Amino acid sequence: MEMKNAKTAVVTGGGTGVGKAVALALAGAGYQVVVAGRRQAPLDETCAEAQAKYGAGERMLGIATDVSDPAAVEQLFARTVQRFGRVDLLFNNAGRGNPPGSFLDWTPEQWREVVDVNLNGMFYCLQQAFRTMRDQSPRGGRIINNGSISAHAPRPNSSAYTATKHAVMGLTKTAALDGRAYDIAVGQIDIGNAMTELASRMAKGVPQANGEIAVEPLIDADVVG
């Protein structure tokens, strides 16, 4: 059910970590929020928490989505518009980390899995958001891509993740120019290490550029939200 005058946000990777924190913050701010992710159960948990904290149950929708599948992403945005009428904000957040071990031992499939989610998936979501925001009335919206500090400071044995995050920066900069014609603002956040499952190993120590193993500080994911 569309709530009168409420804005609508789509949050990918919305079942855990940074995505969940952002989804809950948006729900608290009065948004209608669609959370997308690979598994339905964590999405349902995010929706339930939004209801418990903010009474936002009718403003929440969880849609299991593989962002590396263009057809699934198209369906995500179609269902969002069907339920809430429009899309005002995309937090383009879904991502995955590197395969384990040295890149010398990675298979082509392991490389592609990272690229398919971190880069291709981000493009598919951005593309569908653009199409939706271009065609709706009033036109326009905002897209925030979740980049990474790895786009600025790579670590050893992180070539898949680091390469995709550098590519995301280029995607963001170009999309920001392309969005002007449609009143679509595109930006990017490059946070440090948030306390999520993906970054949990940072607290145990990870390889540094100088060859040392060092513990890296973590921030609460809620700070991002």
What residue ranges belong to the model's regions?
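Conserved glycine-rich cofactor-binding loop
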Residues: 15-17
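Conserved glycine-rich Rossmann-like NAD(P)H-binding loop of the short-chain dehydrogenase/reductase
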Residues: 31-45
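The beta1-alpha1 cofactor-binding region of Rossmann-like NAD(H)/NADP(H)-dependent oxidoreductases
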Residues: 64-76, 108
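Substrate-binding pocket helix/loop in short-chain dehydrogenase/reductase
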Residues: 101-103, 110-112
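Active-site helix of classical SDR
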Residues: 126, 164
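Residue(s) in the substrate-gating loop at a strand-loop-helix junction
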Residues: 148
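C-terminal helical subdomain
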Residues: 184, 188-189, 204-225
